From Swiss-Prot:
GO function term, MF aspect, one: NADP binding
Superkingdom of origin organism: Bacteria
Enzyme Commission no: 1.1.1.25
Positions that bind shikimate: 20-22, 67, 93, 108, 228
A UniProt-annotated Pfam family: Shikimate_DH
Alphabetical keyword list: Amino-acid biosynthesis, Aromatic amino acid biosynthesis, NADP, Oxidoreductase
Protein name: Shikimate dehydrogenase (NADP(+))
Quaternary structure (record): Homodimer.
Biological pathway: Metabolic intermediate biosynthesis; chorismate biosynthesis; chorismate from D-erythrose 4-phosphate and phosphoenolpyruvate: step 4/7
Species in which this protein is naturally found: Bordetella pertussis (strain Tohama I / ATCC BAA-589 / NCTC 13251)
Gene name per UniProt: aroE
Alphabetical list of InterPro entries matching this protein: Aminoacid_DH-like_N_sf, NAD(P)-bd_dom_sf, SDH_C, Shikimate_DH, Shikimate_DH-bd_N, Shikimate_DH_fam, Shikm_DH/Glu-tRNA_Rdtase
Amino acid sequence: MTLPASPPRYAVIGNPIAHSRSPQIHAMFSAQTGRPLRYERLLAPVDGFLPTVQAFRESGGLGLNVTVPFKLEAYALAEARLSERARLAGAVNTLSWRDGAWHGCNTDGVGLVNDLLRLGVALAGARVLLVGAGGAARGVLQPLAAAGCARIHIVNRTAARAAELAAAWRAAAPRTGTQVSAGALAQAAEPGGWDVAINATASGLQGAAPDLPGGLYAPDALAYDMMYGARPTAFMRQAEADGAARCADGLGMLVGQAAESFHIWHGVRPDPGPVLLALRTELLAAG
């Protein structure tokens, strides 16, 4: 008698990790596409990323989503086998075991761009304000440029960090038609306003918004916060008061980056729409 094969094993690794919605998202993608899988949460000690990954691989693991605080360690693990997106992001959030080695990719920016397109944003020729200069901001520069944005202006509480990120991008990135500039938060205003403003800071964790000046938005502009919740974030409320025509949170980005990871692992692109609707309904019910 032949025993049925175990479904392929995947996981999300981080610390903390109990809050992660990734198992729920990938279970819905699995049901939608008919691709059986086992997907779990892996809590790694802050100094134990590599041993945890090794044990996961020895148990048959084939892919990992990587979250805080391990994206840089995942980058180092796969440094010889990085996608262009991961190389330019300087961080890895998706590991795939292929040909006897871990390969690294970064799907955060693709998740953001796909969600902006879902929301009807015309990114070709768009002027984008990117608030924040950390890993979240760096991870979305390449996909935004690839989508044809005319200008990306990075602003940060510490202006020097924004300038460093812009300079690093210009040095490492292929030539595109996208102008990347930088400044302080107080230098966020643009004549005519921005078409899209993206909050890539963690200010929402404290219920706060970045200290931005007023008059930021073009007539049909969208304000987008990478954070998400049952209620509009502080950044979204700030943007609405400043005249942004529309506001959105980052739940669609979360689902979108997971969909890209699923595609990398399984060769099938799931539909994020039903999953996003289910998560939004759940959030609203809990809130």
